[in-house]
């Protein structure tokens, strides 16, 4: 593809309006008052309204707001992070309670400055959520922690309901897209999760539109399946700023549907695939049956409680 063709106009199916009404502002205030970050906000996710209000799910970003890596697709700021905040786990758990979430995703910036990659705080966050919200299902989305499997054990000992780690792109493009990560290291991390916790669903995500070929996407699916990954999500890469990688191509919704069919035929237990799909999209549907039943019982109790003083209805 020539340089003149790289500046592709965004198609109509990607043009969405971000909801910034009173309820959104209240939620944002809750996050700031508790000194918390969400990927939903950082990435200006187009699905924020649906997840926070309708599906009662949210994705918290812990370990600060500064990443030690500088992946060329990601909008999160990079630099030297602050010291660990050991009060963060309880604040996240309290916010889950106030928001009445039924499913929560906990992700984090990469903390290569820490020996354990932040695994101890990550694990304590999961435990704090579980203590205060026993029926809420929990998905974790960590970095590769530089392949430190002791840190992986620390994470898995906290008992998450889903383990998510994204390969992000196909093998050929990994060095350009996420220079300090390794394709095979990510796959091995996912495989080892199944050794530690065979019944925990594993999940990964692929962005398209960075210059990959269809056969490379299919090969990435095969690689994930070979490492016992259960769930895959596929979404369109969108350039956060002009400093980030340009979009090479926008995939049509029909192409995403085709990729979903391929993924399911290959044996993934669940696949979300669409232009606006992100790693945590419809994450509440992807937990195991046992975890889902625990959540159903919990939510029945939540619905009987009085509404919070904050208005979270959109």
From Swiss-Prot:
It catalyses: [[Fe-S] cluster scaffold protein carrying a second [4Fe-4S](2+) cluster] + N(6)-octanoyl-L-lysyl-[protein] + 2 oxidized [2Fe-2S]-[ferredoxin] + 2 S-adenosyl-L-methionine + 4 H(+) = [[Fe-S] cluster scaffold protein] + N(6)-[(R)-dihydrolipoyl]-L-lysyl-[protein] + 4 Fe(3+) + 2 hydrogen sulfide + 2 5'-deoxyadenosine + 2 L-methionine + 2 reduced [2Fe-2S]-[ferredoxin]. One of its GO terms (cellular component) is cytoplasm. [4Fe-4S] cluster 1 binds at residues 40, 45, 51, 280. Its EC number is 2.8.1.8. It is found in: Cytoplasm. It is an enzyme of class 2 (transferase). One of its GO terms (molecular function) is metal ion binding. Belongs to the radical SAM superfamily. Lipoyl synthase family. This is Lipoyl synthase. It comes from Oceanobacillus iheyensis (strain DSM 14371 / CIP 107618 / JCM 11309 / KCTC 3954 / HTE831).
